[in-house]
Amino acid sequence: HAVRATVSDMGPELLSRILSLTPAQEGILHIMFRIADDKGLLLLDLKDLRALLNYVNDHKEDYRMKYGNITTQSVAAILRALLPLEKEGGELFFGEPALDVNDWIRTDAEGRGMVNVLDCVKLVQNPTLYASFLLWLLSELFETMPEVGDLEKPKLVFFFDEAHMLFRDAPAVLVQKIEQTVKLIRSRGIGVFFVTQSPADVPNTVLAQLSNRVQHALRAYTPTELKAVRVAAQAFRENPAFNAEDAIMELGVGEALTSFLGEDGIPAMVQRTKIICPQSLMGAPEAMTRAKAILRDGMEKYDEAEDNVSAYEVLADETQAAEEALALAACAPTAWADISVAMPA
């Protein structure tokens, strides 16, 4: 099934990151979103955004006093930045029906939870889009789910694989947003795990908000790698029974150092733990197995894209009406006033 998000849901900050815009161009994009809100225009897909950019550029003098300077150069740069995004699948990703995270909180007939797998093989080829999607997903969970306090077990747990992509080249304001979301999302009954090769891939401010840690073996030979191991060991609550720094480099296959939040809210001492292997296929499912799972998962509403009335259609109608009005005005007969001339006697 397709996973989609609307342009409005993604917002100007994340969209600016996806498009690699300059601060000046990001400012123009913020103006576009503000104009869309003020005019009641829905930005659902990329053609809506393109239509709005062209429309505002054509009428920029009408908006200059209220919203600030809008330069043709910046608008053109944003339009150019949309081209590679469309080529990389942005036309398919942005649109409706947008993902409703509530659809993931389901149980089967026996009351067991469901595992939802996001196939990001193609999406991950665009690391910036992949990271922005994950961040949007995290924010959507926080904003959508009601506050439920400290539950005995979470309603939903997310495992973000290749988490280093989420933070690579991320501006400070986005890292701060992730930190805030991770800090508060537990009260929504949501658990979040960042899965990555090294703890160093996750900023310290975000690591500080993560209560549960599972650290598999790290191999270190260079001074930089040894420092990373030391930092990883220091993230655990010390256990006098063994040295965590040495243990990380000695762990075998199926072993990990673990530490989880206790009932008193205090992280437990680090333990050397044997991990139970997954009771499933360690690899991609066969095509037939995958097809059967998709057929019975109840997510068929996401299969077909919807093209609802949005900014593209509204602005096209408005432009057509203006052109027809001009054409009528040009074709109307000229009204001549009667002229009386007084002649001398």
Identify the role of each PLM range:
Residues 1-180, 250-251, 311:
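P-loop NTPase motor domains
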Residues 2-5, 214, 250-344:
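Conserved P-loop NTPase motor module
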Residues 16-24, 34-41, 54-61, 83-91, ...:
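Non-catalytic alpha-helical coupling and interface elements of nucleotide-dependent molecular machines
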Residues 63-69, 172-176, 208-213, 230-231, ...:
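Short secondary-structure boundary/capping segments
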Residues 125, 169-173, 217-220, 232, ...:
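Short, contiguous acidic/charged loop-to-helix segments that flank catalytic cores in large enzymes
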Residues 180-264:
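Conserved ATP-driven motor cores of ASCE-family P-loop NTPases powering translocation/secretion/packaging/pilus
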Residues 81-84, 116-119, 157-159, 193-194, ...:
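Structured core elements
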Residues 2, 124-127, 165-168, 200-203, ...:
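Flexible loop/turn segments at secondary-structure boundaries
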